[in-house]
């Protein structure tokens, strides 16, 4: 699951337009940012907000004199508040991050019309990235999954130049596939100095990776069947791998 703290940080700081009832305003003063209202069960009015690294819900009693901050459960034991927070805060922010990855500089591995899309941030010197690349072969080669790799240079001092060599090649996507297939032994024309163009690509990818809350590679992102952004950092186990590749 994607780190919630990060997605909350992506939300725009928009001032709530309505005048808040006194009990809600008192809670707001504790550092909560009110985002929107919603209709709550039992004749109560709900307020959706964020506090530090958490989404929060506040419930105003029908008389308007009391407010309760916390989770609301129904008779089945279902957390109604958490469902709302996921839908209204985390899911939209996750889709925004997905769009940012779509618009980034990635290398295609697989068929461009493969139904399952998986983004992976990878460093040329990352051994787990190479293992993940090998793990993904059955799904990629069968046309079920397309990997979209965003190269970064974070593991070794030589990482940026090596990544730049791949990006500067005639066919970067093909070169990356050959490089991973060779276990990193493919001979590259590594530049003494990384060009401004290639450095910008690497810097942009690293910034995006950081914004997503990942600090190791491979950092893997995919959408769940509920259309929410999911994260797997490091080499996934078999169960997680199946989920990533669409074998829900």
UniProtKB/Swiss-Prot annotation:
Signal sequence region: 1-17
GO molecular function, one term: protein homodimerization activity
Keyword tags: Chaperone, Disulfide bond, Periplasm, Redox-active center, Signal
SUPFAM superfamilies: DsbC/DsbG N-terminal domain-like, Thioredoxin-like
GO cellular component terms, semicolon-separated: outer membrane-bounded periplasmic space
Outcome after substituting residue 126 to A: Complete loss of redox activity
Subcellular location: Periplasm
InterPro entries hit by this protein: DiS-bond_Isoase_DsbC/G, DiS-bond_isomerase_DsbC/G_N, DiS-bond_isomerase_DsbC/G_N_sf, Thiol:disulfide_interchange, Thioredoxin-like_fold, Thioredoxin-like_sf
Pfam family, one: Thioredoxin_2
Disulphides: 126-129
Recorded phenotype for the gene knockout or disruption: No visible phenotype.
Superkingdom in the source lineage: Bacteria
GO BP term (any one): chaperone-mediated protein folding
Subunit structure, interactors included: Homodimer. Interacts with ErfK, YbiS and YnhG.
Cited NCBIfam families: PRK11657.1 (NF008657)
Protein function: Involved in disulfide bond formation. DsbG and DsbC are part of a periplasmic reducing system that controls the level of cysteine sulfenylation, and provides reducing equivalents to rescue oxidatively damaged secreted proteins such as ErfK, YbiS and YnhG. Probably also functions as a disulfide isomerase with a narrower substrate specificity than DsbC. DsbG is maintained in a reduced state by DsbD. Displays chaperone activity in both redox states in vitro.
Family: Belongs to the thioredoxin family. DsbC subfamily.
Protein's name according to its UniProt entry: Thiol:disulfide interchange protein DsbG
Organism: Escherichia coli (strain K12)
Encoding gene, per UniProt annotation: dsbG
């Amino acid at each position: 699951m994607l780190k919630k703290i990060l997605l909350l940080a992506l939300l725009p700081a928009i001032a709530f337009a309505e005048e808040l009832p006194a009990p809600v305003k008192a809670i707001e003063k504790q550092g909560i940012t009110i985002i929107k209202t919603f209709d709550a069960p039992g004749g109560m009015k709900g307020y959706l907000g964020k506090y530090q690294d958490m989404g929060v819900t506040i419930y105003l009693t029908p008389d308007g004199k009391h407010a309760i901050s916390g989770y609301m459960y129904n008779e089945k034991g279902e957390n109604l508040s958490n469902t709302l927070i996921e839908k209204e805060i985390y899911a939209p922010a996750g889709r925004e991050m997905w769009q940012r990855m779509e618009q980034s500089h990635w290398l295609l591995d697989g068929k461009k019309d493969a139904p399952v899309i998986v983004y992976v941030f990878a460093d040329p010197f990352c051994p787990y990235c190479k293992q993940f690349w090998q793990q993904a072969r059955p799904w990629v080669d069968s046309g079920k999954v397309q990997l979209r790799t965003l190269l970064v240079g974070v593991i070794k001092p030589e990482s940026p130049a090596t990544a730049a060599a791949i990006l500067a090649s005639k066919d970067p996507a093909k070169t990356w596939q050959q490089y991973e297939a060779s276990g990193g032994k493919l001979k590259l024309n590594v530049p003494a100095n990384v060009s401004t163009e290639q450095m910008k690509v690497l810097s942009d990818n690293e910034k995006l990776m950081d914004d997503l809350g990942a600090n190791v590679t491979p950092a893997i992102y995919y959408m769940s069947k509920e259309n929410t952004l999911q994260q797997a950092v490091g080499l996934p186990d078999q169960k997680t791998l199946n989920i990533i590749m669409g074998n829900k």
